[in-house]
Amino acid sequence: MKIYLIWGATCTGKTEHSIKLSKSTGWPVIVLDRVQCCFDIATGSGRPHPEELQSTRRIYLDNRRISEGVISAEEANDRLKLEVNKHIDSGGVILEGGSISLLKLISKDPYWCDRFIWSQHRMRLQDTDVFMDKAKARVRRMLVGSTETTGLLDELVAAQSDLNAKLAIQDIDGYRYIMNYAQARRLSITQLLNVMTGDMKEELINGIALEYYEHAKWQERDFPAEWLAERSTR
């Protein structure tokens, strides 16, 4: 069975690449992102809108609420094995994502070493200006949402009514920045929404984009890059 791995830091175009490959091969995309398993923070976690998928199949390793916490890397790895085995008759699957904890666990698990035919494509982190332009455009779309999608701010407001959700969401990029921004101004999230000015919105967009950039640099440092690069020779 063939596995095509698309990996790289946040905001580098992994989803777009996986959709194109899925359209050309007919293979499903299995997402190696633990946070995207939480359906009630779909926007803030970066899940693509169904229309963006262009009729390709995208599989998450779980379907839970953020109040249940983010799935562990160990459980995600176990579920990944099950999902891959479900699609043996497809001839191949596409793995897409940037969860360092999950990729590190996969790299240490003998299960993944010799039983599959691997190919891989790394989405490289671009220079600061290019990254920030893309990240700010992405955050601008995500922040408020539209008539068809829930915005990141709406997801954050909904989480405030559940202590477990609130505790879990404060560890996630974007949400964490907004919570700290509101706290520094002694505002609740709802109050922040009510007094939001255009300048404040721009401050949030820039701040969240910078938080994404710091996360992306951390990912670049911590990926099991040598093991991942070797997958193209197996």
From Swiss-Prot:
This is Adenylate dimethylallyltransferase. Disulfide bonds: none annotated. GO terms for biological process: cytokinin biosynthetic process. SUPFAM superfamilies: P-loop containing nucleoside triphosphate hydrolases. It comes from the Bacteria. Belongs to the isopentenyl transferase family. Transfers dimethylallyl groups to AMP as part of the biosynthesis of cytokinin phytohormones. It comes from Pseudomonas savastanoi (Pseudomonas syringae pv. savastanoi). The keyword Glycoprotein does not apply. GO terms for molecular function: AMP dimethylallyltransferase activity. It catalyses: dimethylallyl diphosphate + AMP = N(6)-(dimethylallyl)adenosine 5'-phosphate + diphosphate. Its EC number is 2.5.1.27. The keyword Transferase applies.
